[in-house]
Amino acid sequence: MKKIKPPHYWHEAKKFLSKKDKKLAKIINQYDGHLVTRNDPFYSLCRSIIGQQISVKAADSAWLKFEKVIKKITPINLIKLSRAKLVSVGLSRQKILYLRIMAKEFFHKRLDVKNLQKMSDEDAIKHLVR
């Protein structure tokens, strides 16, 4: 994994959180807090979709099960997975649909990932949910 430049709000957010909570400030100051990337947008988007709107514990559990059934996280491996396997890891019908659509977009190279990385969060979301 490689270090990436933090978003524009990163340092301000760390200062804000440190002022609000002394215990959290101690933790923030103990670590350099750099961000890392796997440099794999497909992996990152899968992880984001699986973790949406559920607790961290549930997301981690679903993710570990997902990794186990897919073995290597690639668009073609996701496309090949049966719906039953995806349900067995705890994914909802809607998440399965989103993951499959995204996998097909990546597989057929219809998703401009380089352009996506340059977009604001809002523009990236609009592009992904079109």
Regions found by a protein language model. Give the residues of each.
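N-terminal polyanion-binding entry modules of DNA glycosylases/AP lyases
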Residues: 1-119
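Catalytic DNA-binding helix-loop module of base-excision-repair DNA glycosylases/AP lyases
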Residues: 50, 119-130
